[in-house]
Structure formats: structure tokens, C-alpha cells
Amino acid sequence: NRDTTWRYVLVVVAVALSLAAWFCTVFGVYATVNVTFESYLTASVWALLLVAAVLLYTSQHGLVPNCILLYPIFGASINLLLGSLTVRTQVPMFFDAVGTAIVAIIAGPVLGMATGLTTTVLGGAYFAYNLAFAPVGIFIGAAVGLLARRGVFNKLSWIIFSGLGIGIGSGVMSVYVLIFSFSGHPRKGPQNLTKFYEMIFQDERLAIILQGLTSDILDKVFTVLIACLVLRFMPKVIARHYTVTFNHE
């Protein structure tokens, strides 16, 4: 079917561009740049991710109502707001993917991925640090969207188990980003938890890995739970604006 083939191609190209952008972050000079547009390398990474996000939006044009195509922007705004509120705390969670989870449940995996990328593009328009974590946002959007399509979030136990699985996956990816893009030295996050693990194991890199896994697992369980609760108890007058055939259940 030609109508679906070109959509799949755009999604595949978008993911490939995102991976290419991440590959650019493993060069040593990337970790030394703070402001995105002060370096050709970080500016190129940002541009690749922007193109990838546009391709994801384009792949869904005509497939969902036009109003739903705007949801990733609102989801990204939620991510940035909640993320900025928690980034300076020592709480071992981030809450910067709640918007991604909400949109992925409503609109499916592709627009969930678009929400994750939009968050990265907007958040990385000035600070280059966030750009390296683009694959994590894509993974979360895709995973939540696919699980939602299979009705996994209808039971609390499955919500928790799904959050654990997504947390482990995103945690492993985040650890790889920290090691390869930033030589194992995060610039933000719950440093007290990292110091706690380092005190116990006397190994800085192991402490960073354990902190990343712990934080991501806890964060994603609560992220999915919050997203499901928001949609479950959304007033009907609002819910009817985003309820369509494929997400009615």
C-alpha cells in the first residue's frame, strides 16, 4: 500500500537521522560545548534532530486529525516544565517524559516519538547537553505508544510492569549516552544518589550507572502511572476532543 509505505519510510529515515545525530555526540569536542550554536558540531546535531522531528510529523499527516498533530508540542511543553521544576532537586526522578507518555497513549507511537524529539529540539535550542539524549526520548515515545495500542495500560499491575520495563530500557540507553557522549560525567541529576552509590562501591563509573538505572526505573514507573491517571480522570468535555477510533479504549 503506497499510502502507508511512504509513512514507514519517513519514520525509518527520522530514526536513522536521530541515531546519526547521536553518533556525532561521541566526538570528544561535543562534551566541552555548552551552548548549542557556538559550535558547528552541536548546531549540526540540533539541525538533524529538527529534520527528524519534522519527518515524524509529516508521516502522520492525513492519518490523524490535524488537531492531534499539535499534541506533541503541548506534550513537549509539559516535559520541559516538569523537567525544569525537578532538575535542581535531589529527587531521583525527572518527570521530563510525562508529556511524551500522554501523547503516545493518545496519538500512538510515532507522535509519541515526535514528542520526545520535539522536547529535545526545544530544550536543546540553547543548551547542547540535552541533544545527546534524543534516542531515549524516541524510545520512550515508541514503547509507550506500542504498549498503549495493545491495551496494556488497562490494569494497574501492567502499568507498573510496563513502567519498569521502559525504565530499564531508557536507563541502559541513558548510561550509554553518559559514557560515550560525556565520558561518564553527568552535568545534572540526583548527585546525592550518585555519591551514595560511590561511597558504597568506591567506583565512580559504577555509581553513575547505578544512579542512572535507579532514577530511570523509578521515573518511568511514575511517568506512565501519572500519564494514565491524567487521561483516566480527564473531564469528559476535554477527553472528547482527543478521543478517536484508534484510542477509544
Could you describe each region identified by the protein language model?
Residues R2-D3, Y57-C67, L147-W158:
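Membrane-interface helix-boundary motifs at transmembrane edges
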Residues R2-L50, G83-Q90, N130-A132, V152-E249:
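Membrane-embedded alpha-helical hairpins and interfacial helices in multi-pass inner-membrane proteins
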Residues W6-V11, V64-Y71, V110-G112:
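Membrane-interfacial loop-to-transmembrane alpha-helix junctions, especially the N-terminal start
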Residues Y8-V11, V51, Y57-G62, I140-A148:
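Histidine- and aromatic-rich ligand-binding microenvironments
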Residues L50-S77:
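Helix-loop-helix hairpins and the membrane-proximal interhelical loops
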Residues L70, F74, I78, G99, ...:
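Alpha-helical membrane-protein architecture signal
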Residues F74-A76, A104-I106, G165-M173:
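Small-residue-rich segments of transmembrane alpha-helices in multi-pass membrane proteins
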Residues A76-A148, W158:
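Alpha-helical membrane segments and adjacent membrane-interface helices in multi-pass membrane proteins
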